[in-house]
Every structure is written in C-alpha cells, then in structure tokens.
Amino acid sequence: MEGIERENGCFHTFCPIASVAWLHRKIKDSFFLIVGTHTCAHFIQTALDVMVYAHSRFGFAVLEESDLVAASPTAELAKVVEDIKAEWQPKVIFLLSTCSCDILKLDLENSSKDLTIRFGFPVVPVQTSGLDRTFTQGEDAVLHALLPFVPKEDPKVAVVEEKKRSWFSFGKDEGNKASVPAAPTRNLVLVGAVTDSTTQQLQWELKQLGLERVDVFPSGDITNMPVINEHTVIVPLQPYLSDTLATLRRERGAKVLTTLLPIGPDGTARFLEAICAEFGLDASPVAEREAQTWRSLESQRALLRGKRIMFLGDNLLEIPLARFLTACGAEVVEAGTPYVHAKDLSEEIARLREKGVPIVESPNFSAQVERIDRLRPDLIVAGLGICNPLEAAGYTTAWSIEFTFAQIHGFVNAIDLIKLFVKPLLKRQALLEQGWTEAGWMS
C-alpha cells in the first residue's frame, strides 16, 4: 500500500499461545490446552506465572520423544482431556498448536474430531503457531475457530399461523400448519475479546444514542453466540482480526464497517458516529462526549505534546495507538508494526498519512536501531526483551505488552490509556531530578 514501507524483518514479539492470558477469562466454561514442547511450557510459566499458580483454565500437553514416532497423538491427548474433564467440566476445549506441531506434522485436526466424538463436547483445533503469527493474532485464530458455533439465523423466530375457516369446521377456526418466520432485522455485532466491562461501556454508549441491541462476539457462553448473517453489521474492536473478518465477509455475507477503532476519545467518537450513520441514528451527542473526555485528559496531554515517540512493532496495536498520540499533539517519528491489514485499517492509516507519520511493516531491528540513534525519540514503545537494552542506552521506553492487557477502549478507559504513555516519561523526569544522569547510563 502506498505510504507504507516494508523491511521484511524478524518478529520481536511473544508467541501467539500467550493469548490464552485473556481468552480463558473471556470464554466461560472453556479450557485451553496447548500442545508443545518444554520450551513452550517454560515460556508460558515465565510470561504468565501469576495465572499459572492461580489455577487458571489453561494447561499444557508436553510433547515427549515417544510422541515423535507415534502414529497419532490422539491416545495421549485423550488421557489429558480425561483429566481436564474430571477437574473442570468444560463445555469446550481449545486445542492450540505450536510451531513444534507444525514442524513435526502432528495431525491435531483429526485428533480433535476423534476427541469430540469420544467425550461428547467440542474439542476445537486452533492454529496458533508462532512461525507466521504474532502475539495478538492468537486471538484471531481462536475467534476464527469459534465461527462454526455462531448461528446464521436467530432460533427465536416469531411463528405466524394463518387462520382460515373450513367447510366442515362447524364455525371453528383451524390453524394452517405452515409457519412463517419473522422478517429478518439488521443487527450490530462488536467483534473482539475485550473485557466485559469494556463491552458494557460501549453498549451503554450506543444505547444512549438509540441502539438498543448490541451483540458481542465472542460472548462468554459458547452456546449463546450472536447471530451473524447477511443482515449483520460487524465492527471490529481490535486491529488484528483480519482472518475472522474476512471469513465473516465471505461466508456469512456480513458487512464489516470500516472506521477508527474505539481507542482514545477521537477513535471512540468516530467509531460511534460511523455506527450511527449506518443505522440512521442521531450522533450529535457524541461530539460533546468526546470534548468532555479530552478536557479530562488535558494535564496528561500537556506532557505528551511535542514529544517524539517511536513504535518498534510488537502487538499490532501500533497504528491506532500512533493515531491517538498524534491527536494528543505528540510527534510519532515511526509506527513500526509486524503486519498492516490495509483493508480493515484504511481509516486509521489515512489519519496517520495526513499527519505524515512513517509506517513501517515488518521492520528490520538493526535498521531501527540506526534510526533510533538518528531520531533520538523521547519515548520508545517496544517489547519486553528490547526495552531493557534501550533503557541501558539512555532511552525511555514503554512496554508494548501493557497496552495488550490494559483496558484501553472507549471514553471511560481513555485516562488509563494515556497514563501508559505518560508514566515512563514521569519516571524519567523523576530520575533526572534525583541526579541519575551522573551514573552515565542515562543521557
């Protein structure tokens, strides 16, 4: 796409299996079983240690040497599923594959079918290999695997019986056995595994604007997913759901509304206005709601105004976050991101192009280091493994993973979003006031 530079660099990001951190909380009565090596298990234990010890609804089936020569992994997986069923009684088990499964050519698809028949509840295979996916795309893979559970028609249809008089009815009415379903209506579905409180806030905002029914995919219950068909308007809440959105367009005929993501006051306002325009609602109250939110953020905006900020690329949230920062008055010197889904992010990209923000897809880290030395940004947003070396070199950093786990959508959460950028700047200022520049590691 014009205005986007591609460098074909390596990903510096978490493995997609880490997406279980928020997905196991979103989908109730589920269990996420990751099939991988000891290395994969150690990664999850290190990255999500608190959740592991909290006895969360995810676990590991560790591949051993004997599995390499086994005809099928089904028998060993069945033992693990048996234990999960006894302890958790799940309605669904997601069987997450890793790059090890891809390399060893393990047939988890057929194993999942066999396990589903054997245990009487869905065992769903999910492709979460880190070979060609980034951290947050694990969510996209899980939502895509959930689509077969999404109904195409509302089971609650109004039945209309045609009454007519029969010659031999003796004055009584007889109902025609043929029933007519109710006329289909348009419905709105927000797509993305955000927290329940975030979806409730967005539903409340839309209800205030006159839209009573707002569904969310995924819902917390696998047996109660929203109807999605050709009468459905889909609005994504996250920038990394391209496979799910493409399938809904192609197979369900749903309309995917392209607008800004509801991240920051500006994005939330345009998000609500686009929905109102689609459903013929009055969006005039949105402007005051946006202005009110911006006023509440003014003290934080003052700290960001004029600051030079650079994204190295990690969780695919970089483009909407960069757009929000430009609205705050900051100068984004580079928005690096692993992938750019131009079709679904066309509005976001257009905003950055208007501001002259360089967008770099799949950035080369060595080239980025050279650009860092040349541009000298005030704040660098990067992955955990890169932040510490940059801090040692005298740069101020923000962990990109914090934006993944924080609630950053909607007007209410805008204060938490902006604080994630302001906090490291305030920390650096406090260190400078304490004379830490004398240590030589901070320039």
From Swiss-Prot:
Protein's gene: bchN
Binding site for [4Fe-4S] cluster: C15, C40, C99
Family recorded in the similarity comment: Belongs to the BchN/ChlN family.
Transmembrane segments: none
SUPFAM superfamilies for the chain: Helical backbone' metal receptor (SSF53807)
Protein name as it appears in the record: Light-independent protochlorophyllide reductase subunit N
GO BP of this protein: light-independent bacteriochlorophyll biosynthetic process; photosynthesis, dark reaction
Keyword Oxidoreductase: yes
GO molecular-function term, one example from the UniProt record: ATP binding
Keyword annotations of the record: 4Fe-4S, ATP-binding, Bacteriochlorophyll biosynthesis, Chlorophyll biosynthesis, Iron, Iron-sulfur, Metal-binding, Nucleotide-binding, Oxidoreductase, Photosynthesis
NCBIfam families: DPOR_bchN (TIGR01279), PRK02842.1 (NF002768)
Record pathway: Porphyrin-containing compound metabolism; bacteriochlorophyll biosynthesis (light-independent)
Subunit details: Protochlorophyllide reductase is composed of three subunits; BchL, BchN and BchB. Forms a heterotetramer of two BchB and two BchN subunits.
Gene3D superfamilies with a match to the protein in the record: Nitrogenase molybdenum iron protein domain
Annotated source species: Heliobacterium modesticaldum (strain ATCC 51547 / Ice1)
